[in-house]
Structures are given as C-alpha cells and as structure tokens.
C-alpha cells in the first residue's frame, strides 16, 4: 500500500486539485458571463472607452441623446476611411469579417455638423476633449486622420469619437459609420473612470 507521503502520489494529487480548481473557475466564469449576457450586459476589455460592464439599451433614435450612448459596431475594411488603416481588432466571430466589434461613444447624429482639424473634433461648435490626431499608433504603425473639413451628418450616419482616450481609433481616423453597422446600443453600468496613458491605440 502506498501512502500519501509518497512524493509522486502527492505531486499527482496536487496537480489533480489544481485542475479541479481551474475547471470550477472556468465554469463559474462561463456561468456569470452567460447570465450577464442574458440580462443584456456586455463587458468591454478595450482601452478606448472605460473598462467595465455596459448595459444594453434600446435604439435611441430621437434626440436629445443624454447621456450619449455607446455603440458596439462592426467596421468594414471597404469603408473609404478604413482602407490602409491598421486592424486593432481581435479575432472573433461576432462580426461578418471574423473580428470583434469596436465600442465607441456616439458624438454626432444626423443633422449635426462635425468639423475635423489639427485642433481636434468639433461637434456643433463644441470642441471635444482628447481628440487630437496622431500620425503613428502606439506600436509605431503609420495612421492617417480622416480628411480635415466640415461635415454635415447625413441620415443613416453616426460619428463615434472617444474623449476618454486620446489614443482611441475612431471617427477621427475613419470618418462617419453607417448606423446599420451597429450591433448593440449600450450605456456604462459599472466602469472605471480614469484613462491609463500606457494603453495602446484601439
């Protein structure tokens, strides 16, 4: 008879215990994730908007939009403003192209006027904070701002720009997005409130 004092048996017992713990944790995380998703909650892991939990809302089709909603949307490399830009999205089957959606706050709606310049993004005469453009991302890849100018937001269009992160890859680089690309409308539910400068462009 071999007792638990046997080194090999003890080692196997410890490994089995750890494996059981990992399995329990994995099932717990999956259960919580499915429960939150079923209740209309979405978790944001990116750095361009506050990290944390967002609550899904109905499509806010009419103004006033207070507080401004956020959107999860699926970009398309065929959009004029997306051609030649780096792809920061993680592989995922959520969007038709096999990558994860982006999450950004909506700052301009049909009928609004957007002006882009070297000073940043202005909506209806109000300059948005942290919207200066850069010519290279955090990894050193070239990145081009959307053509500077004044734009009247057309029906079926939205402008999505994050003031939370000066490194956000958003409409300041790819311009307006089609409203039909939106997968979810959300509002912050339980999120961080401070930007971390070391975060990468996403």
PLM regions: where:
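Extended hydrophobic leader/signal-anchor segments used for secretion and membrane insertion
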Residues: 2-202
């Amino acid at each position: 008879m071999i007792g638990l004092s046997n080194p090999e048996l003890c080692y196997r017992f410890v490994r089995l215990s750890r494996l059981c713990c990992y399995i329990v944790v994995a099932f717990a995380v999956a259960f919580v994730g499915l429960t939150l998703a079923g209740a209309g909650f979405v978790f944001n892991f990116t750095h361009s908007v506050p990290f944390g939990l967002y609550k899904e809302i109905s499509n806010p089709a009419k103004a006033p939009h207070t507080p401004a909603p956020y959107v999860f949307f699926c970009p398309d490399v065929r959009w004029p403003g997306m051609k030649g830009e780096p792809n920061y999205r993680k592989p995922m089957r959520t969007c038709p192209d096999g990558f994860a959606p982006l999450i950004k706050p909506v700052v301009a709606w049909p009928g609004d006027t957007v002006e882009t310049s070297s000073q940043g993004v202005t909506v209806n005469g109000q300059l948005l904070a942290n919207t200066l453009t850069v010519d290279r991302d955090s990894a050193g890849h070239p990145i081009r701002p959307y053509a500077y100018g004044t734009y009247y937001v057309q029906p079926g269009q939205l402008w999505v720009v994050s003031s939370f992160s000066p490194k956000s890859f958003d409409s300041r680089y790819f311009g307006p997005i089609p409203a039909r690309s939106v997968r979810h409308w959300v509002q912050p539910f339980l999120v961080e409130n401070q930007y971390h400068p070391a975060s990468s462009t996403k």
